[in-house]
């Protein structure tokens, strides 16, 4: 059984069913529509249509018995977990690229949650069994720090910090091209692409989507690429990937947002061949969650800053690209 209530803090023209795709992941949009039509999901206590446009102040109540959650057993799996920090309430893990965070319809094994269940006796279950312990997410191909909570109380404490934007995060990335400014801010509104709900679009119009903001600093600028540090202020899905793509400097290897093989075609044939080889060799997008700073639970206000070492494949990629330009 999934029981939850969401309050809409801003009206941005988003449909109810699309809004819940992210909130109720991995339940499909078609399944969510069925629940809405069957009155298992209400807005302000009333039955509405899946296409209902959410308004500021709306209360969305979800009370569903989800077969996906019930039919996927969360089996403990022995796997190497790189623990960066642990206390009685919080766990910080250095997630490798390629590791999916939690089970879903297509992958009920080999996820970070399966590993956490094996290694830790206590994990929060506030977001259901499929997301045991998980406070926030990283894309499968993104490596780096991710937080998990051992208790529901600690989970709510951490979630509150994310919502209030007091958690400070730094991401390291390799991007295409030359940046116009060494330091800057990318801000605007992000929304799901209607033709493909797994991807997002960016707009400067406030009515289109959720507000997003990312600060950035170009650490090293090379001829055809750059090493960039991103400091997300908000935490929208795919935010850094969407932002870097929007300004014309997509993340190296990011096929979804213009940083893949097609980007290499903009260069001379010999460079295109070289970049294609590097893209195939690297096999993912070059984005790493490098550091996180937050307030520890029941610590009297003590903050902690954690770093996750840059992965070896990331270091090799930068050295290879740099070597080709020298």
Residue ranges and their predicted role:
Residues 1-31, 79-81, 220, 233, ...:
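Pseudouridine synthases involved in rRNA/tRNA modification
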Residues 73-78, 204-214, 286-287:
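Short coil-to-beta-strand transition motifs
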Residues 158, 236-244:
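Short beta-strand segments enriched for Tyr within beta-sheet-rich domains
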């Amino acid at each position: 059984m999934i029981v939850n209530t969401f309050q809409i803090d801003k009206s941005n023209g988003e449909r109810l069913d699309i809004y819940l795709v992210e909130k109720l992941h991995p339940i499909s949009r078609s399944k969510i529509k069925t629940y809405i039509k069957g009155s298992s999901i209400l807005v302000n206590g009333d039955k509405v249509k899946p296409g209902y446009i959410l308004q500021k102040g709306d209360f969305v109540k979800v009370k569903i018995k989800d077969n996906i959650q019930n039919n996927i057993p969360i089996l403990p799996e022995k796997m190497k977990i790189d623990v960066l920090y642990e206390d009685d309430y919080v766990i910080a893990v250095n997630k490798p690229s390629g590791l999916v965070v939690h089970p879903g319809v297509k992958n009920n094994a080999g996820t970070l949650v399966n590993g956490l269940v094996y290694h830790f006796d206590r994990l929060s279950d506030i977001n259901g069994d499929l997301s045991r312990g998980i406070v926030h997410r990283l894309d499968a191909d993104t490596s780096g720090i991710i937080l998990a909570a051992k208790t529901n109380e600690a989970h709510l404490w951490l979630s509150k910090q994310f919502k209030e934007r007091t958690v400070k995060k730094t991401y390291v990335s390799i991007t295409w091209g030359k940046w116009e400014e060494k330091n800057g801010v990318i801000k605007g509104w992000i929304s799901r692409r209607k033709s493909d709900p797994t991807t997002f679009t960016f707009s400067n119009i406030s009515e289109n989507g959720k507000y997003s903001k990312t600060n950035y600093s170009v650490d090293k600028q090379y001829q055809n690429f750059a090493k960039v540090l991103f400091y997300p202020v908000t935490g929208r899905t795919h935010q850094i990937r969407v932002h870097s793509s929007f300004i014309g400097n997509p993340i190296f290897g990011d096929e979804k947002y213009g940083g893949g093989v097609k980007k290499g075609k903009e260069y001379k044939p010999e460079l295109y061949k070289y970049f294609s080889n590097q893209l195939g060799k690297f096999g993912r997008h070059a984005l790493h969650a490098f550091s996180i700073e937050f307030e520890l639970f029941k610590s009297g206000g003590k903050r902690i800053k954690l770093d996750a070492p840059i992965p070896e494949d990331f270091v090799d990629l930068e050295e290879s690209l740099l070597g080709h330009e020298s």
